[in-house]
Amino acid sequence: LFYLCHELRHAQQYLHPQQFEQAVVESLPYVILYNGTCFKLCGKEWKGCVLPGSEEYFSDVYLSLPYELDANAYAYRTVKFLLGESEALDKLYSMWLPKKRISAEEYRKLFEQVDVATEG
């Protein structure tokens, strides 16, 4: 149920971006995976690149993406509302929190790198 709610939240983010904080909206065109593989939505096409860095760093980057933090928090709140308090739910939610949060400034720099790497 957690993952269903998480993915439904992503659908809501893309369909109704005006309902979300600016940080979520600005991050939506970007996908940054655990291994540094990145994608940017350019019109209707996804363009890819790979940025250098460790898997540990990019795991935190992925987990700190504003749209991921929002989707995980939404899934947690929704499941908790529907099924009540649960140690298993708390543990699952904790698993999807970054060890080190990435700052908005660092995201701006990363998104700029992806922009440059996916041009042309």
Indicate where each model-derived feature is located.
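Short pre-active-site segment immediately N-terminal to the catalytic Zn-binding motif
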Residues: L1-L4
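Catalytic Zn2+-binding segment of zinc metalloproteases
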Residues: E7-E26
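Metalloprotease/metallohydrolase-associated module, dominated by Zn2+-dependent proteases
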Residues: V25-E119
